[in-house]
Structure formats: structure tokens, C-alpha cells
Amino acid sequence: MIGILKKVFDVNQRQIKRMQKTVEQIDALEPSIKPLTDEQLKGKTLEFKERLTKGETVDDLLPEAFAVVREAATRVLGMRPYGVQLMGGIALHEGNISEMKTGEGKTLTSTLPVYLNALTGKGVHVVTVNEYLAQRDASEMGQLHEFLGLTVGINLNSMSREEKQEAYAADITYSTNNELGFDYLRDNMVLYKEQCVQRPLHFAIIDEVDSILVDEARTPLIISGQAQKSTELYMFANAFVRTLENEKDYSFDVKTKNVMLTEDGITKAEKAFHIENLFDLKHVALLHHINQALRAHVVMHRDTDYVVQEGEIVIVDQFTGRLMKGRRYSEGLHQAIEAKEGVEIQNESMTLATITFQNYFRMYEKLSGMTGTAKTEEEEFRNIYNMNVIVIPTNKPIIRDDRADLIFKSMEGKFNAVVEDIVNRHKQGQPVLVGTVAIETSELISKMLTRKGVRHNILNAKNHAREADIIAEAGIKGAVTIATNMAGRGTDIKLGDDVKNVGLAVIGTERHESRRIDNQLRGRAGRQGDPGVTQFYLSMEDELMRRFGSDNMKAMMDRLGMDDSQPIESKMVSRAVESAQKRVEGNNYDARKQLLQYDDVLRQQREVIYKQRQEVMESENLRGIIEGMMKSTVERAVALHTQEEIEEDWNIKGLVDYLNTNLLQEGDVKEEELRRLAPEEMSEPIIAKLIERYNDKEKLMPEEQMREFEKVVVFRVVDTKWTEHIDAMDHLREGIHLRAYGQIDPLREYQMEGFAMFESMIASIEEEISRYIMKAEIEQNLERQEVVQGEAVHPSSDGEEAKKKPVVKGEQVGRNDLCKCGSGKKYKNCCGIGK
């Protein structure tokens, strides 16, 4: 084990040694950079850009560019980056993660690679977790970049399209991760390329990279529209679930957070809803609503998972403790919680476009990130994002005192000890930061401190508006600050001069399921070589301890006759807690990896559709593409109607009817002409006739209008079909895990079925576009926007007359009968698709 650790450590050491040599090169350039005037320093930017056009690379420019930024930072910001910050900048430029401890100046470090990569003119995105940090960094660090002649933009949620375009056109753009993802999705829903805001994704530096790429990796960004569904079922399911008793009617597994009806519960449901079998296919919706109501009542807790604010359910981010306004749980869980809390139930939504942060950020040519805590997730960063974690040494050694955990028998004993510790430290004037996992814990400690007469600030999702002010005051003498999780991350706690010698005390009220979050809390103390102390208080009733078998420990404490006020300080327990955390982290990583495997199926499909949309938007003339679609549609129709081996069984009448109804006019293609041809020869005369009709249509209107009409039709069909496909893939995903019971790998099944559904969607797109182009009359002065919304297109009269049902030769096949082609599928899912 020690050998492995040494090996890992050595890899990091080797990287540091290598970067140290580059730092020495940068230092050696200082005497030639320092004497330059401000104008000469700014002129370096133009010089670098010219050198890039002549064939030099950004790697060649690195030492000189970093030396220029260091000198500019000293002049403009009054801050001179240390050697370790230069190392952090090199690691970022190379597309890695710089692990730099709290207070080591990550924001200043980022200016070095940001400047260097912005010289290419392709744009650099600096990504933060919230708009406050984006605005702060853009205004503070923006001065430095503007001094050097680069343009800086900030991308905010409230901005208009024109303002966003300007922000993205800048050399450097500051933005939140959410806004970047949503802009990407919106860009792929617009109808004119002038409406796009983003440029191709070149280089991004993510601040607090673990928060965005690990904690939020499973959170999909969704743009949705309304799906009209009744809210009554939620009310009924909610009323029913209120009558259930734990363990008798349902079982709840604390470890997996799984809740399900027992036999008694199922019987109760069947009686309550007057049905014979709850698991009958026709009761799928009811069962789903009952399950979601159960989850709302048993798994989801008010003030921990969500809060009720102004008559709405607002989700609480489990990692940052912030309120996530505008976000909703999917699959009807949000509506179930609304029913539980008695607020207005809002309609379920239909997904129009979706992407996860994992897949969005993997589209950048180069990606890097900074954080104080990434080493525990190194495997994930390497495997999923191809980024190495490089631990950058601190500028001054860390002298913080990290004490062993104190473990109490009950929660009550633990909280009494926490409050006593806070009171004692407060009397001595030492500033204290108390970290809690849930909002309710922070409010409980707040009440206990108020009773003791200790003034304090509370920082949780309910009052995050004052976040920066509260954090700024947290290091002054006698300050007591209670923070949920890592609210306030990204803002440093600076110590008052009169407490520099004692430092900040950090008290953790329970261990988080992720070691990383605990390390972040510890890292708030002892920044830049300051003193500090950290202490975690645990109890046998904490969720992490409950989930991973603390019964034996509790029994031992009982046997030893230990009361609530006596903690045990045991290496064994600390190790058990750490191994429990590792297990949870492993489970969470597996879940994220699995999500990525599933999401990759949709990612590949999304890339195909978005690439086609882009081509359509940029193309001047779509006629060639549309003719290709018509050819495919005709070939599919011919194959479908001539698949029998015996010629007499071919359904030529059905083929002619199909062509007359969807593509041509009555009499354009005759049965007797086609009967003389082999199937592979039939397509040619049909396509020739189609092109003839297409030419006739071209003569009826100006060319510009025809080209616009083609675009309109393609956009309308592709967007409608793609939205329906996303919805269908959602449903497939929800039901696919049930296949595991049949000894089938659900992921492989999802990939195969998803691919088949995608192919079927492409065929359907081609057919519908061909039909619209050949059969629709268009109004003059048509607007692309109007038509995409379903106006201005009318089926022509000759198309109406030809609408005869395709005839199936010989024996009629019922929609639910097995298909005659021998595929083993039902007729409606095989040869009868679309009939």
C-alpha cells in the first residue's frame, strides 16, 4: 500500500519538478519585462498574436506570456503571482486540474492560462458556480485582461440575445455552468444562424471543478414545454399514501433510499381504488403516481431536500445547500411533493432539449479546472474527462490542527457538546465556523446558541442573498457563523488582525457522505499558513453511521455504561467512517458512470441531429438534401410493398396509393408500369417523376421563397420529431431496468432499442419532409417562425382527393396480429407502421 502511495506521490512530484523548470524560465524573463512601459506591455499582446499566425504555438509562448501577465497583475491589481500560482497556471494550460488549497489564490492563477489561450482569438470560457462569482471575477480580473488589450464579456441569465452574442464574441467570457449549457441547447433550437450566441467551444477553465463535474454531473439541463396532464391523480395518490403505515403497508431501505409497497399496501391500494390488480398494464399510471407519492412522503424531507417558499416547492442543492429556483424534480415527483405540501400542483413538462454537464463540457477542445479538493475523485476525472489532478504545493506550510473525531451516543449529546465548544471559543474571542449538512440542523444549533445568548450569523439556502457579507465577517473576533454544507464557497474567510495568532475554528456537526465535502470544510481554516483548528462531532444516530452499521458500536457504548456527555475518540471509528464514505463515493461514481453510458446513447443521436440542423441553417440551397430524403423514402416504400418472395403477393396497388397520397398526383405512376419492373428498378421512374413535380413547384414561386420554404419544412419536421424522440427515449429509459430481471443487460438493450428508435425517427423525418415539400401549398411572404409554429402551410386540393387507404392484398391483417413477414412482431410495429 505504501509503495502504491509513493508511486502516486512520485508522479505528482515529477510533474511539480517539471513545472518548476518552466517557472525558472519565467523568472529569468522578469528583468527584460519589468522595465517595459504600460504601452509596451500592452503591445506584447499584438506581438504574441502575430507570432501565433507565423506558426508558433501557445506552448512556445507560455514562459513569456506568463511573465507579461505577472508584471501586469503587479501593476493593475497590486498582486504578484507566486511561483506556486505559476505552476497552477501551467497545469491549467495543459488541460489538467490544479488542486490548490483554500486561500492560495486560484482566481489570480486562472488569469495566466486565460490570457495565453485567449491570444488564439477562439474564445476562453471561465466557468463559476454562481453569477455573483462570475460578476466579481469578471470585474476584478477583467481589469487585468483589458489592460493587456483583450476583450472581456460576462454572460448572465437576464441578458438579451444581443448582449449574449457580444459576451461570447469577447476574447474571454465569464459565465455560470448552467447558463453555458442552456445557451448551447437554445442555439440548437433557433431558426436563423444570426440568432445563435455561442462560438465553437474552445477552452474552458472551471472554478470549483469538483462541484460542477462531480456533484452536479448527474443533473441534466432540460428545456421543457408544457405537457397537458391531469393533476387529479396526484391528489388521489397523496390522500391514499397518508393512510399507510410504515413497515406494515410499505418498506423503506435507509441505505438505498428505496421505498415500496408491501403485500398489505398493495391490497389496500386495490381496495381504495376499486381495482382487481394494481400491476395490470392499464393501471401503470396509477401505480407510478402512488410510488411517487410514497417517495414524496417517505424519502423527501422538508427543509432538507426542499423548502416551501411563496407557495412553491424549491429544491435545495444537497452539495452546496443553495436553493435551486426554477429547477423541478422530474417524472412527477415534484407534483407529488406539491400535493403533499398542499400547494398548487403545476403541470408536468415535456422535454424539448436536454444535456448533462458531463457531455456538455466534454465538447470543449481543451478543458481544465481548479479546486481545493479533487484528489479523492482523481479516477473519475481521469476516466471520464481525461484530466489529471495535479496537487500544487502551498506557498506557506499548513499549520492547521485537524483533530480526531469525537463520537457521541446520541444526537442530543453531540449537539450539547457542539454548543458548549462554540460558547467556550466565543468567550475567548476565537472566530468559529460551524458546518452542517441540513438546513434543519443549522436552525437547531441556531436556537440552542440563541438560548445561550451567543450572537451568530446563519448561512443556508433560505438567506443566501447575504452570503458574501456573512462570509466576509466570519473571520473577525468572536464571530460565530453557521453554514449549511459549503454555502459561501468561492469567497475567502479572511482573519481579523486581532485573531491572527489563534486562527479560525471549524466545527463539523456530522460527516458528509463525501470526504471531499469534509475536506472543503476543514480547508476553510488555516489558509495561507494561518493557524486554525478543525473538529468533527459525530453521533451513532447520524445518517452515515446509521447507513453503515453502527449498531455494534452503540451496543458497546451501552455495555461500557457511557452516558451522552462522554465522547469516544477512536481511530477505529474514524477508519470505519472513512471506509463508509469511500463506499458511498464508490457507489456514487458508479451511478455517474452508468448515467454517462446511458446518456452517451442520446449524446450520439443529439450530435447527429444538431449537426444536421447546423448544416440546414448554413446551407443556401437544400434541394439536394431533400432529393436524397425523397429517394430514401421511395426506396423504403418500394421495399415495404414488395417484400414477399412471390411476385403475385406484392402489394403494387398499395404502393401506388401510398405514392399518390404522400408524394405524387393521381395518375403520375400507374400500376401496370410498375408491375413490369423488378423491385430494384421501380424506384428510378418514381424518383424521376418526383423530380419533375419538384421542378414544376419551383416554377410557381421565386427561388428565394422556395429555398425559405424548404428550410421551414425541414426545421418544423426535425424539431417536432426530435422532441417526440427525446420523450420516447425517457420512457424507454424508465422501463428498461425491469429487463434486468429477464437476464438481459438493460444498458445493451437501451442502446439497441434506442438506435432502432433513432433510425425509425430518421425515416419518419425523411418521409414527412418529402410529403410536406410535395403536397403543401404555401402562402406568399411566409415567415419561418410562423410556419415552424404550424401556421401558413395548407395541404393542396389534389393531395386531399388522393387520400385513399393503402390496400393490403389478400387476407386482411389485424393491427395486433403477428406480421406476415415472419419477423415475430405485431403487424402495427412492423410492416403496418404508419398504416
Swiss-Prot record:
InterPro entries, from UniProt? Helicase_ATP-bd, Helicase_C-like, P-loop_NTPase, SEC_C_motif, SecA, SecA_CS, SecA_DEAD, SecA_motor_DEAD
Location in the cell: Cell membrane; Cytoplasm
Enzyme class, top EC level, equals translocase
GO molecular function, one example? metal ion binding
Q: Which GO terms describe its biological process?
A: intracellular protein transmembrane transport; protein import; protein targeting; protein transport by the Sec complex
Taxonomic superkingdom: Bacteria
Q: What is its EC number?
A: 7.4.2.8
Xref: SMART domains: SecA_DEAD, SecA_PP_bind
| Annotated positions binding Zn(2+) | C819, C821, C830, C831
Task: List, alphabetically, the CDD domains matched.
Answer: DEXDc_SecA, SF2_C_secA
Cofactors needed by this protein, per the record, are: Zn(2+)
HAMAP family per the record? Answer: SecA (MF_01382)
Descriptive protein name: Protein translocase subunit SecA
Species the sequence originates in:
Bacillus cereus (strain ATCC 10987 / NRS 248)
From the UniProt record, report the name of the gene that encodes this protein. secA
